A protein has these predicted regions:
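Amphipathic alpha-helical dimerization/coiled-coil segments
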Residues: 1-15, 37, 85-110
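Short, hydrophobic secondary-structure boundary micro-motifs
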Residues: 43-44, 73, 91, 107
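Short, hydrophobic-biased segments on the C-terminal half of alpha helices
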Residues: 61-62
C-alpha cells in the first residue's frame, strides 16, 4: 500500500475548492441565480420557482449554506435565505485573480 502524501494547500486553493464544490451542481447554481435575481431574502418560495422536490432543495440549500455562499435566518416557522454578497464577491475575486492570471500567462496549448 502506498504512503499517504501530506499536501499543504494554500488558503486560496482551499477556498476555490470549497466554492467549486458548492457550485458543482446545476441546481445549486440555479438557486444562487434565483436568490440574486430576487435581490432579497426568500422564505419558502424556492420550491415554487424551481422544478425540484422540497427535500432536494433543502439538501442543496444546506450545501450552499455550509460553503458560506448563502445565509439562512429563521423567520417564524420558516427559514429565509439570501446570498452572502461579501462571500460571493470574495469567491469572484479569488477566481478572477487565479484564473485571470493563468489565462494571461498562457501562450500556447498542445
Amino acid at each position: 500500500m502506498g504512503a499517504s502524501k501530506i499536501i499543504n494547500y494554500s488558503e486560496e486553493e482551499l477556498l476555490i475548492a470549497k466554492f467549486a464544490k458548492a457550485l458543482s451542481h446545476p441546481a445549486r447554481v440555479a438557486i444562487i441565480k434565483l436568490l440574486l435575481e430576487k435581490q432579497s431574502c426568500i422564505c419558502g418560495d424556492i420550491v415554487e420557482d424551481l422544478p425540484i422536490a422540497q427535500s432536494t432543495v433543502s439538501q442543496h440549500l444546506k450545501e450552499l449554506k455550509e460553503s458560506g455562499l448563502i445565509k439562512g435566518n429563521i423567520d417564524g416557522a420558516s427559514i429565509c435565505y439570501c446570498v452572502d454578497t461579501h462571500v460571493l464577491q470574495k469567491a469572484n475575486d479569488i477566481l478572477n485573480k487565479v484564473l485571470g492570471a493563468s489565462i494571461q500567462t498562457q501562450t500556447t496549448c498542445c
